[in-house]
A protein has these predicted regions:
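C-terminal lobe/lid and adjacent interdomain/linker elements of RecA-like ASCE P-loop ATPase modules
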Residues: 130-151, 155-204
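ATP-binding Walker
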Residues: 13-14
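Pre-Walker A (Motif I) flank of P-loop NTPase domains
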Residues: 3-6, 115-116
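ABC ATPase nucleotide-binding domain signature region
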Residues: 5-7, 17-83
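Conserved P-loop NTPase mechanochemical-coupling segment
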Residues: 78-98
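The Walker A (P-loop) glycine that initiates the GxxxxGKT/S ATP-binding motif of P-loop NTPases
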Residues: 9-10, 122
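GG-anchored amphipathic helix commonly corresponding to the ABC/SMC/Rad50 NBD signature/C-loop
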Residues: 98-122, 130-142
Length: 204
């Protein structure tokens, strides 16, 4: 994963979160999300894969900062941000007092900075189409400032991230690079939007 932005695609249960969590653990992040200094655990469910991964770093490119964002446990991360009294680094308002999407956009706007390693698991879970486009703009700025992103996503909009490498995990567990036009969420969304009735006809 040497590209500035690597997007992990694949069906539900294909292993994206397991992989991104293992990278996070190997990189020293809290398995439940947050920065490398977060050290809370509500329930240890991480796989042991992280202990078997060796991360290869470009010499002289140790991340200056970073964040592991997992949509499913951001509530607990928000509680930790409040407990540590560091809301100032997140836009000044506790994530608990913002909407789900607002709190994500606060995070990327205020806490993310140059030269960072950012591991994001389905950030689109909180975001509107506009929010996804705002995230793409912020990613472009941070990449220009030397940051690296690994993002698990089902979003055709995030898969359009310029210059990104898309790795798709197939049904057999194989990981293949694919183009934007080949990526499954793009193919399926295009087919659905071209003729919703064809898909929905089976429901009635
Ligand atoms: N704590 C766990 N213990 C055992 N198996 C697990 C655990 N968490 C997930 N799995 C299994 O590992 C497989 C991969 O799960 P994973 O969460 O990585 O998928 P995913 O690609 O992120 O899916 P989704 O798109 O639904 O988020 C699934 O079959 C899942 O049931
Ligand atoms: Mg997942």
């Amino acid at each position: 994963m040497s590209a500035p932005v690597t997007l992990l695609s694949g069906d539900n249960g294909s292993g994206k979160s397991t992989l991104i969590e293992a990278i996070a653990v190997a990189a020293g992040f809290n398995p439940e999300g947050g920065t490398t200094s977060f050290n809370f655990a509500t329930r240890a469910t991480e796989s042991s894969l992280g202990g078997h991964l060796t991360l290869v770093r470009t010499p002289g490119r140790k991340p200056r900062t970073g964040f592991f964002l997992r949509a499913e446990s951001y509530y607990n991360v928000a509680t930790e941000i409040e407990r540590l009294g560091v809301t100032g680094s997140y836009g000044g308002v506790s994530p608990h007092q913002r909407s789900h999407g607002e709190s994500f956009l606060d995070l990327v706007a205020h806490r993310f900075g140059p030269g960072g390693l950012y591991l994001l698991d389905e950030p689109e879970a909180a975001l509107s189409v506009q929010g996804c486009l705002a995230l793409l703009l912020r990613i472009a700025d941070l990449v220009a400032d030397g940051s690296q992103f690994v993002i698990a996503t089902h979003s055709p909009i995030l898969l359009a991230c310029p210059g990104a490498t898309i790795l798709e995990i197939g049904p057999g567990g194989g990981i293949e690079p694919v183009s934007f036009d080949q990526a499954e969420p793009v193919v399926m969304t295009r087919a659905f939007l071209a003729d919703p009735a064809r898909f929905l006809g089976r429901l009635t």
